[in-house]
């Protein structure tokens, strides 16, 4: 049998950390653009503010540690963390919240444990949980998508509301001053309606829902899905974790929907609501805090998907990805210990 042999050299090129981070950031852009289109300029302002704070904190910590500031900033990890925090919080959250969350992510979660490659938890999700637990009202106050809002804030309006230093912050002023802009997310709305005794069909008759998914959120998730597929094509991430997350969430939500369609949302709703695609391709795939073996990555991803469904349906926080990712981060060493690949010539561990 004749074998086809490729010409030399046979050495594959390893991607540098900065290159991987650049690719992830570029693939995030479609989702960021669509998110800004539906939820206004506030998202972009939050992202830019987070980047400034993250790079400043990164430089300050490197200076204190007598490390190269240029090398640390050029790996783009701080910028990626900042973007993930910026797109995760409500567009018109007060400025001090994004500052607090970003400082916590970079200084405490990342560098307190030794810097890039040593952190135990995903910095962006740890920051999100800190803000959500500390300021639940502000963190659950999103603005209505532009397609259903009576008024859409301009760039100037967004800046004024974000940087308002009043006691209640920009979002509170928004609720009092402009009708038809602030509202709960589809996940929050559905969970509240179900607790009041409404069926899924009755809840989804509201204007915030369209075609079984949330208005705006379907397209945001679709954009992050497109970016994630490009990321897979570029081989910046492996397919195991993303597949595990989506499969775990799909299977769990399908079982729930089949058992009780009147009180459970469809798998389509779960897959294209909240931060599902963002988390599946850009957050859960963090190589530092995830499991390492192929089989371990699948288990890690599936665990996140199942936890998301359980927390969304039984917990107090409808979009549960931050908690699910952090809990899976805790389980990653355990998964790696019991799902180690067998070394050639040795028995299984």
Swiss-Prot record:
InterPro entries: NqrB/RnfD (IPR004338), RnfD_bac (IPR011303). Its cofactor is FMN. Keywords: Cell inner membrane, Cell membrane, Electron transport, Flavoprotein, FMN, Membrane, Phosphoprotein, Translocase, Transmembrane, Transmembrane helix, Transport. It is found in: Cell inner membrane. It is an enzyme of class 7 (translocase). The modification FMN phosphoryl threonine is found at residue 185. Belongs to the NqrB/RnfD family. It is a multi-pass membrane protein. Part of a membrane-bound complex that couples electron transfer with translocation of ions across the membrane. HAMAP family: RsxD_RnfD. The lineage of its organism: Bacteria, Pseudomonadati, Pseudomonadota, Gammaproteobacteria, Alteromonadales. This is Ion-translocating oxidoreductase complex subunit D. GO terms for biological process: electron transport chain; transmembrane transport. One of its GO terms (cellular component) is plasma membrane.
């Amino acid at each position: 049998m004749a074998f086809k042999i490729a010409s030399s050299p046979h050495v594959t090129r390893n991607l540098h950390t900065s290159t991987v981070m650049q690719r992830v950031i570029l693939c995030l852009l479609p989702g960021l653009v669509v998110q800004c289109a539906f939820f206004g300029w506030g998202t972009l302002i939050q992202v830019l503010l987070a980047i400034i704070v993250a790079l400043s904190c990164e430089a300050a910590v490197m200076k204190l540690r007598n490390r190269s500031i240029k090398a640390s900033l050029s790996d783009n990890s701080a910028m990626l963390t900042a973007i993930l925090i910026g797109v995760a919080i409500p567009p018109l959250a007060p400025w001090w919240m994004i500052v607090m969350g970003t400082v916590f992510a970079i200084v405490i979660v990342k560098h307190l444990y030794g810097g890039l490659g040593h952190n135990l938890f995903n910095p962006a999700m740890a920051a999100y949980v800190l803000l959500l637990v500390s300021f639940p009202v502000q963190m659950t106050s999103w603005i209505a998508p532009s397609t259903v809002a009576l008024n859409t804030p301009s760039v100037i309006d967004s800046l004024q509301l974000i940087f308002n230093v009043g006691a209640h912050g920009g979002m509170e002023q928004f609720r009092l001053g402009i009708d038809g802009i602030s509202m709960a997310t589809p996940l929050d709305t559905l969970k509240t309606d179900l607790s009041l005794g409404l069926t899924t069909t009755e809840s989804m008759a509201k204007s915030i829902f369209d075609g079984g998914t949330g208005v705006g959120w379907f397209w945001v998730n679709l954009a992050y899905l497109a970016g994630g597929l490009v990321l897979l094509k570029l081989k910046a991430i492996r397919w195991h974790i993303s597949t595990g997350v989506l499969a775990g969430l799909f299977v769990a939500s399908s079982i729930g929907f089949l058992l009780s369609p009147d009180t459970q949302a469809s798998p389509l709703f779960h897959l294209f609501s909240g931060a599902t695609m963002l988390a599946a391709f850009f957050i859960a795939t963090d190589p530092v805090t995830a499991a390492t073996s192929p089989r371990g990555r699948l288990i890690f991803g599936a665990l996140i998907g199942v936890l998301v469904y359980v927390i969304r349906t039984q917990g107090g926080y409808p979009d549960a990805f931050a908690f699910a990712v952090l809990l899976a981060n805790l389980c990653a060493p355990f998964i790696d210990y019991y799902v180690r690949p067998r070394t050639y010539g040795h028995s299984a561990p």
